Amino acid sequence: MSSTLDTQHDVAVEKAPARTAPPPMYQVVLLNDDYTPMEFVVKVLQKFFGKNQEDATRIMLQVHHEGRGTCGVYPRDVAATRIAQVAQYARARQHPLQCVMEPV
């Protein structure tokens, strides 16, 4: 904290540091399609979202049965980067896998 002196009353006043609000968070949601193999979805969840085998399989099954599954919650820039990485990786391997971000 910084201090300033009020010369009229000889009182030291401390100013609190400015606090910034946390960034808005977004969930990255993987969408189901009829063409991407389940094993590929598990690999994507492990590679880009740091999921272990068990969590990746659980999310993949949620995507398969419910049509969508949350991969993680991130600040906007991180979420957008992960989505772009997944899209590029899937496209390069001839898979139509898609994910989107939604505000939390």
Swiss-Prot record:
Classification via SUPFAM superfamilies: ClpS-like
Cited InterPro entries: ClpS (IPR022935), ClpS_core (IPR003769), Ribosomal_bL12_C/ClpS-like (IPR014719)
GO biological-process terms attached to the record: protein catabolic process; proteolysis
UniProt similarity note: Belongs to the ClpS family.
Task performed by this protein: Involved in the modulation of the specificity of the ClpAP-mediated ATP-dependent protein degradation.
Quaternary structure and partners: Binds to the N-terminal domain of the chaperone ClpA.
Protein name per its UniProtKB record: ATP-dependent Clp protease adapter protein ClpS
